[in-house]
Amino acid sequence: ASDVYKRQVDASSVNAPDVPETGVTFAENSLLKARAVAEATGLVAIADDSGLSVDVLNGAPGIFSARWAGSHGDDTANLNLLLAQLSDISSEHRGAKFCCAASVASPNGFEAVEYGELPGELLTAPAGEGGFGYDPILRPVELNGENALYEGQYAGKSCAEIPAEIKNSISHRARAFEALIPQIAAALAS
């Protein structure tokens, strides 16, 4: 595995194309990006697409998470719009999860996608300064309750209030890429 890290290159360093996210799922968008970079560079490529899925919104904002309020990447506007949309929703109906589809594609056509999720509950107001996006309003379920990870040390905390190394260890991206490792090895061997 350490050899893989020695050989990694950033997409921008090989003039990889900027790929429009035209898919209708996280998996489709992730594969579009990995496939385009693999085809353009002749290298094995990995990519991901991720976002927030809110139960009472039937999975929205989903693939539109980064542009929920209209402008791509306006985290504050996205977060404020979502909170306004959920303002009359009681705490027992504020279930949500961060979702990630991570993919690998090789120039010879090998493709694979793996998924990761971080289930949680949405707070009614932002809490914390860390992270980005919707981190200030998602409280991870597994850090709360009887079987809480880290002995309940982070109970009640949003993703923006917990240390980055803790958040990263339980994140949807970490889980998706951990699941993708065998597929990356297979792509490199293909």
Predicted regions span which residues?
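Anionic-ligand binding patches
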Residues: 6-190
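Short, small-residue-biased leader/transition segments that mark boundaries at the very start
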Residues: 1-5
